[in-house]
Swiss-Prot record:
It is found in: Membrane. It comes from Homo sapiens (Human). The gene is OR52E8. Gene3D superfamilies: Rhodopsin 7-helix transmembrane proteins. Residues 52-59, 123-144, 221-240, 296-313 are cytoplasmic. This is Olfactory receptor 52E8. The lineage of its organism: Eukaryota, Metazoa, Chordata, Craniata, Vertebrata. Its main location: membrane.
Length: 313
């Protein structure tokens, strides 16, 4: 009897449908996802290796970049392998516990990415607005403290989601029309009130919006400082140091912003568009970030070229 009740309260598994409406082309959709994952793995691993081995990159900016690379490896690995399983091998079933774990890591790494981008904006603000005090402010101790705060805040945002879902009874269908498990997608399957889940989810969105506001404020101060510089050459040089970070911010927040808008207001938009946009903001940034920094950062570019030249010889 207890086993039956437990099964009714928490289903043994869920079914992830992938991208509803595009099932016939799942196998082809999986191809770009596979290459994106390959770029994310190779690119972020290469950047971590270069930052570790290149003495000139042992600076606060690159320590934050190493954090971002580690997060991107985690985020891409938490999402894409399961997607490829759905697209190529039709492995749509995922256990209840597996789905919660899947959700935890996706939301955790997403929250981490957001706050690390704030830390990187703070780094650029100090570098441009207080250059003489840069190494005095961003000491190893402060960087470790920022990393600790990023982890703790992300846990604060995500751990309660697990318990909010565990308290819910699931007595309806167990089909999730998505490529991965996410909080509200699971909560909507419950046959009880999910008001607390919605409120906590809105609280998390508010924290992410706060991150965006902090980044904007940092760049307002940066732009003010830049345009106070005496020459255009100095201004362009200062702005160039922010180019990679701005590219990474846009790669992360732009798909997330459009995904939120279509989910909130695009009721007439086909469901597969919602799912594709939701995939973009967890899949694309981990692949784009190493490309953006690799192309725009001279030390990284030269170090990678030296590695390839040694390999060829």
């Amino acid at each position: 009897m207890s086993t039956s009740n437990h099964t009714q309260f928490h289903p043994s598994s869920f079914l992830l449908l992938g991208i509803p409406g595009l099932e016939d082309v799942h196998i082809w959709i999986g191809v770009p996802f596979f290459f994106v994952y390959l770029v994310a793995l190779l690119g972020n691993t290469a950047l971590l290796f270069v930052i570790q081995t290149e003495q000139s990159l042992h600076e606060p900016m690159y320590y934050f970049l190493a954090m971002l690379d580690s997060i991107d490896l985690g985020l891409s690995t938490a999402t894409i392998p399961k997607m490829l399983g759905i697209f190529w091998f039709n492995t749509k079933e995922i256990s209840f516990g597996g789905c919660l774990s899947h959700m935890f890591f996706i939301h955790f790494f997403t929250a981490m990415e957001s706050i690390v981008l704030v830390a990187m904006a703070f780094d650029r603000y100090i570098a441009i607005c207080k250059p003489l005090r840069y190494t005095m402010i961003l000491t190893s101790k402060i960087i470790s403290l920022i990393a600790g705060i990023a982890v703790l805040r992300s846990l604060y945002m995500v751990v309660p989601l697990v318990f909010l879902l565990l308290r819910l009874p699931f007595c309806g269908h167990r089909i999730i029309p998505h490529t991965y498990c996410e909080h509200m997608g699971i909560a909507r399957l419950a046959c009880a009130s999910i008001k607390v889940n919605i409120r906590f989810g809105l609280g998390n969105i508010s924290l992410l919006l706060l991150d965006v506001i902090l980044i904007i404020l940092s760049y307002v101060r940066i732009l003010y400082a830049v345009f106070c510089l005496p020459s255009w050459e100095a201004r362009l040089k200062a702005l160039n140091t922010c180019g990679s970070h701005i590219g990474v911010i846009l790669a992360f927040f732009t798909p997330a912003f459009f995904s939120f808008l279509t989910h909130r207001f695009g009721h007439n938009i086909p469901q597969y568009i919602h799912i594709i946009l939701a995939n973009l903001y967890v899949v694309v940034p981990p692949a784009l970030n190493p490309v953006i920094y690799g192309v725009r950062t001279k030390q990284i570019r030269e170090r990678v070229l030296r590695i390839f030249l040694k390999t060829n010889h």
